Amino acid sequence: MCIRDRPLSPLDGRYRGAVTGLADFLSEAGLNRARVEVEVEWLIALTDRSLFETSPLSDADKERLRALYRDFGQAEIDWLAEKEAVTQHDVKAIEYLVRDRLSALGLDSIAELTHFACTSEDINSASYALTVKRAVEEVWLPALDVVIAKLRELAAEHADAAMLSRTHGPVSYTHLRAHETRHDL
C-alpha cells in the first residue's frame, strides 16, 4: 500500500471540509502569497524613502506591484515549485519570482532592492503573522460569530433552565460568557 498520496493529517483528510477556508491562508500557497506581499511592500517602502538612488514609485507602479500578490495564482505556484526544486530554498524562490515579475513590469531598476537587508526569517516571520492574522479575522472569527449567534438563540429558548456551575467550591449559578469572550478577542 502506497501512503504517499494520503492526507498528512486528519485536517487534510476527514476534516477537510471543515477547514477548507483556512487553506487560502495557511497552505503553502497562502504562505507564499504572503511572502510575495512582504517582499513587494518592502520594495515599496524602500523606494518611498528614495533609498539607494531610487525615486518613489508612481501609484500606478505600486498597484502593478501589489497585483503580484493580489493576483497570486496557479501560474505563480507552479513557477515557484520549479524554481524551488533547483534552489532548495523557499524564500530564495520567492525572491527570484519577484525579480522576474519586476523585469516583466519594466521595473528592472529596483530589482536589486528585492530582499535587500532581509533574512529569510524576516520574510517568514512577517508572512506567518499575516497568514495567521487573516485566517483568524476572515475565517475563524466569522465562524465563531455563527456559534455565538446559535448560543444566543439557544439561551433565549432555554432562559428558564437552571444551570449549575461548580469547580472546586460550592455550587453557583453561571452563564457561559460567550459574548464577553468574543468581545475580548
Where are these regions (language model features)?
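Short, small-residue-biased leader/transition segments that mark boundaries at the very start
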Residues: 1-3, 178-181, 185
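A helix-coil-helix interface module used to build multimeric assemblies
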Residues: 4-177
